[in-house]
Amino acid sequence: PYDEKYMADLEAVAAQVTLAARRSQAPAIVCIGSQREEGLAFNRRFRMKDGSEQFGPDKQHPTALDIDENDTDCCGPAGPTDPEFGVIAVKRELTGEPFALIVDYALHVDVTSGDKITSDYPGIMREQLKRVYGEGLVTLFIQGASGNINHCAYLQHSPFPNFGEWKSRQIGLALAGKAMNVLEKALPSQSSTVEMLRTVLAVPRYPKDDMVVQKLLAAIKAKKPEELAFFETVFIKLYNEYSDEGTDEREVLTLRIGDAVLCSAPGELFVEWGLEIKKWSPFKYTFIAALCNDYVGYIPTVEAIQRGGYEATPIISLKGTSALGQMVADANFRNLQKLKAE
């Protein structure tokens, strides 16, 4: 529910922080860099032998992590990851010491799991960086295009926990080390331009009469009530309440900071869309900022919607048109071209 007091307080705090930042302005150098970070993030969707795709490699136990690949119908991961770990470091001009970092990586922030309120692995990373660079260091973690990416090393038979506080700490420490490596090698930006472009998309809602929706609905209705899985019960409820009429406004922001750009998405963008945005970017460093200023649910590829799976289930996981991913990518593409030309 909308909390009027919280929103009013939030505006006041934002204003106070802005004024404090303005008062503390000082000459600084922006340094930018990136490196590959592999072995921590994995594509969590798997292609099955019947051509479908799903969350996890085993149909009977989709979240299990100790699966023998010989005992499943899984053919392998259904997509790539984005291993780029990006850092934008703001350093003091006189000393070269960093006092603010933007860190970007494509990995779900849901490692600790359960119903705890936690800063998860970005919090561990932040605290470790403070131990090195001082308590005054501000670290902003931005989640990249990771709608279909998580931390679970499926089929690798790791003897270590794949979720919980131990795993969160492992990832946080590893990324803190990577952040230090990148920022210590990062070179000053050749450009001092800071500019942002905003595009508001009119996004059609996912149609209720779509083939994917109707096929799922028919399969659920063919079952007896006592046979329904939890998500099937939820789907029926949401389907009955859902209206596909009209459009919704969704915001896309593209922010340039020197030689780097941050390209936003209003939900959990699939990694394939993030890689496409990066491929066509004219900038040296292009980072993706998912879950920005809105939450439309998952933003999968059209192929993923056709093949099924948790993240690609209409009405439950996505409510916008199947073309939303392309709309977001294209909006960022146009903004990138304009920012480069200016």
Feature locations, PLM:
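Non-catalytic substrate/cofactor recognition surfaces at enzyme active-site rims
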Residues: 1-342
